[in-house]
């Protein structure tokens, strides 16, 4: 693979990681990290990050702006599809009944998947639509803060 391409992609990945982390999401990079968080009681929003255009243009901005709300999950975490493969695979084991999809969001409550917002519900939609989908999940499964 071309060295310039690798450098470019490393920069894209780093920017994508920084963007979601600065929004308040904890990076989970190992299967152990995933288990430690998702087995906890309460609600956890998992953002399955990606380098695709709909992740950067829609999903990550929605992940950030949806948090300007009174009803929120107990925890915000992210795994990076294609980068942190072990963590992503383990997270997907919790998403029973849903096909692998990135970018996407999964709301886990007490260690069990409640619902997902899959790529097809993100791609081709605008940021506000995805924010509304997230906040609908928050209203349904989370508590006011």
Curated annotation (Swiss-Prot):
One Pfam family per UniProt: Disulph_isomer
GO biological process terms, semicolon-separated: cell redox homeostasis
Taxonomic superkingdom: Bacteria
InterPro entries on file: BrxB/BrxA
Family: Belongs to the bacilliredoxin family.
Xref: NCBIfam families: YphP_YqiW
Name of the molecule in the record: Bacilliredoxin SAOUHSC_01610
Species whose genome carries this gene: Staphylococcus aureus (strain NCTC 8325 / PS 47)
Lineage, opening ranks: Bacteria, Bacillati, Bacillota, Bacilli, Bacillales
């Amino acid at each position: 693979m071309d060295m310039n391409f690798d450098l470019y992609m490393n920069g894209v990945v780093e920017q994508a990681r920084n963007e979601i982390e600065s929004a308040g999401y904890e990076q989970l990079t190992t299967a152990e990290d995933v288990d430690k968080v998702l087995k906890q009681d309460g609600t956890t929003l998992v953002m399955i990050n990606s380098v695709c255009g709909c992740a950067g243009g829609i999903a990550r901005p929605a992940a950030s702006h949806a948090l300007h709300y009174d009803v929120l999950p107990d925890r915000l975490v992210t795994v990076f599809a294609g980068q942190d493969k072990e963590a992503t695979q383990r997270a997907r084991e919790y998403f029973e009944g849903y096909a692998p999809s990135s970018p996407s969001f999964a709301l886990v409550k007490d260690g069990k998947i409640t619902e997902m917002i899959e790529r097809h519900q993100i791609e081709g939609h605008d940021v506000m639509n995805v924010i509304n989908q997230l906040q609908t999940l928050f209203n349904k499964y989370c508590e006011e803060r």
